């Protein structure tokens, strides 16, 4: 889906068309928040007094994805006024999706996620007051300063208008520059029924109305509140935080997939450390990841971990995760030492965690199963846990062993995890530098060369198929990786010398 100014224009066009037909319509929710923060929104949502049936009839290409909740998707191609399919093959056109939701009030939430019933309303204020947080409860009228221009179709932006530049840091919530439609026009176009503007300026995440009621309606809102606070560098308002602590146990009723997705966003938005600190102080961490919560207070040997306990060390890794990092690397960083708490032992010489890698792999597998990760993601995250201690042995590895180490899928993630692990501990990057230099210097074709021989050649050479083939081929590959042999002829000669055939029909002499 296309992003940016074009999508903004399309959303404004949708609003303009609804206005022409006599309905209220505004930009709503996260896109308003992000515009005011000087960030480029990922999506533009519209809230309107028009019912879903009206929206479906007004626009040529629509999808009633949430009709029960008053949600319709409007598809537009090539520009704010071009329906999909106009002027050619719609499959080759740039297209935009705008989510249009009817003003509504919600009934009871018996499942802790969806309202049992909704009632459409003509009141924008009533619609806003059912939402989660004040910073997400703002509406914006993008036509306020341009709707007097009749030459602009459906209220499209006048030529030359543009979004405020996206802030490159979080120095201040209103970091947008006064250009194009600008900060002042943005602020003057906002409808605020819940005090969201003041909370944006103060940097506060506050539930709309009674926090307990908002969290009873949708328990996942507690995790979303933590994520917003971490992402924007905001504080959680005291009453909202108290409600989170009191209702944390309600998260047990939320589907594991929804919890997983929210945690993954926390881990990959560039504020993972702050997010998990907030999960801890709100009591939510114990509910969603008790294995991670148990890292707190687990001492480590000071000579290797001067930073402190396992929890502090793990936070040190999370603090290094960059925005947009892969989910597998992020979860690998979070869980790499999950096996330490149950293996803690105070030995005569120092604190030890014997077998913590194997225990961690088993615990990680259970956590990932619980959160219903895909098989592919599970394999990669468990591989990161399983191999994170191997770097210390790399200098003593045979060349063949080192090359097989490099064959691990997404080996760059193993390098990244080990580097973070070192920097969150002693700071010694000696092993990381050794492995990185050799990995970068080693041509891919030498790490995974074509096999010199296969089972077919062994049969042709007189060997009977059997379990011994695996050992023979492994020995050949070892020699090839070590650079001892390089041709099929050398491979067969080595096999005949190391695995001679007896006189009884191709069996190998042991």
Where are these predicted regions, by residue range?
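Catalytic cores of the polymerase beta-like nucleotidyltransferase superfamily
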Residues: 1-160, 164, 169-510
């Amino acid at each position: 889906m296309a992003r940016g100014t074009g999508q903004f224009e399309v959303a404004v066009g949708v609003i303009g068309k609804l206005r022409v037909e006599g309905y209220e319509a505004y930009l709503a929710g996260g896109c308003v928040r992000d515009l005011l923060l000087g960030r480029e929104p990922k999506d533009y949502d519209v809230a309107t007094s028009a019912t879903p049936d009206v929206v479906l009839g007004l626009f040529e290409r629509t999808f009633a994805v949430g009709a029960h909740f008053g949600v319709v998707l409007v598809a537009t191609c090539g520009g704010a006024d071009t329906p999909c399919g106009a002027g050619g093959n719609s499959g080759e056109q740039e297209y935009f999706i705008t989510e249009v939701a009817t003003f509504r009030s919600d009934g009871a939430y018996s499942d802790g996620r969806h309202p049992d019933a909704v009632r459409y309303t003509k009141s924008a204020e009533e619609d806003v007051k059912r939402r989660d947080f004040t910073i997400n409860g703002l509406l914006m009228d993008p036509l306020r300063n341009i709707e007097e221009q009749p030459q602009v179709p459906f209220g499209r932006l006048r030529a030359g208008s543009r979004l405020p530049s996206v802030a490159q840091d979080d120095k201040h919530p209103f970091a947008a520059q006064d250009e194009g439609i600008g900060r002042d026009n943005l602020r003057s176009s906002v409808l605020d029924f819940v005090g969201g503007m003041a909370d944006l300026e103060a940097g506060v995440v506050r539930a709309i109305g009674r926090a307990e009621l908002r969290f009873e309606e949708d328990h996942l809102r507690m995790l979303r509140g933590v994520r917003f606070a971490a992402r924007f560098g905001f504080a959680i308002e005291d009453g909202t935080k108290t409600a989170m602590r009191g209702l944390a146990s309600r998260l047990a009723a939320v589907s594991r997939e929804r919890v997983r997705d929210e945690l993954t966003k926390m881990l990959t938005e560039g504020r993972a450390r702050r997010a998990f600190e907030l999960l801890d102080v709100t009591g939510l961490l114990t509910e969603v990841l008790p294995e991670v919560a148990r890292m707190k207070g687990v001492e480590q040997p000071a000579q290797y971990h001067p930073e402190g306990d396992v929890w502090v060390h793990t936070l040190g890794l999370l603090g290094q995760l960059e925005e947009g990092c892969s989910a597998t690397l992020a979860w690998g960083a979070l869980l790499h030492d999950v096996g330490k708490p149950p293996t803690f032992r105070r030995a005569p010489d120092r604190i030890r965690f014997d077998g913590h890698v194997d225990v961690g792999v088993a615990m990680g597998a259970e956590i990932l199963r619980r959160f219903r990760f895909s098989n592919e993601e599970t394999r990669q995250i468990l591989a990161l846990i399983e191999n994170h201690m191997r770097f210390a042995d790399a200098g003593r590895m045979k060349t063949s062993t080192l090359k097989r180490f490099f064959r691990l899928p997404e080996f760059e993630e193993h390098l990244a995890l080990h580097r973070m692990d070192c920097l969150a501990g002693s700071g010694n990057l000696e092993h990381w530098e050794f492995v990185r230099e050799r990995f970068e210097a080693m041509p891919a074709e030498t790490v995974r060369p074509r096999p010199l021989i296969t089972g077919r050649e062994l049969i042709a050479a007189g060997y009977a198929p059997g379990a011994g083939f695996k050992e023979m081929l492994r020995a050949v590959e070892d020699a090839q990786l070590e650079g001892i042999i390089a041709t099929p002829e050398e491979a067969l000669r080595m096999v005949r010398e190391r695995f001679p055939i007896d006189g009884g029909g191709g069996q190998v002499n042991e």
